[in-house]
């Protein structure tokens, strides 16, 4: 009876991990940092997130109007 109980507890633990989203790959998620320079109000129309990527030579950073794409040059 004890091995069956242990197996049931193990299966329940695995199911609970899946219900919480499973294992998370921290390298896959991009961290959005605060912009190094204060952006102009014109840049506030170019919103981004780690789902919506910015163009080349631009990074997604957090500003007063939300997450925006800002030039790194």
UniProtKB/Swiss-Prot annotation:
Protein name, UniProt field: Protein WFDC10B
Keywords: Secreted, Signal
Chief localization: secreted
Naturally occurring in which organism (per UniProt): Homo sapiens
Subcellular location: Secreted
Gene that produces this protein: WFDC10B
Zinc-finger keyword on record: no
Gene Ontology MF term list: serine-type endopeptidase inhibitor activity
Signal sequence, start to end: 1-21
GO terms, biological process: antibacterial humoral response; innate immune response
Any one GO CC term of the record: extracellular space
């Amino acid at each position: 009876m004890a091995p069956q109980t242990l197996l049931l507890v193990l299966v329940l633990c695995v199911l609970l991990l899946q219900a919480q989203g499973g294992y998370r790959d921290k390298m896959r998620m991009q961290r959005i940092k605060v912009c190094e320079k204060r952006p102009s109000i014109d840049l506030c129309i170019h919103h981004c997130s780690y789902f919506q990527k910015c163009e080349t030579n631009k990074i997604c950073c957090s500003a007063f109007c939300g997450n925006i794409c800002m030039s790194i040059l």
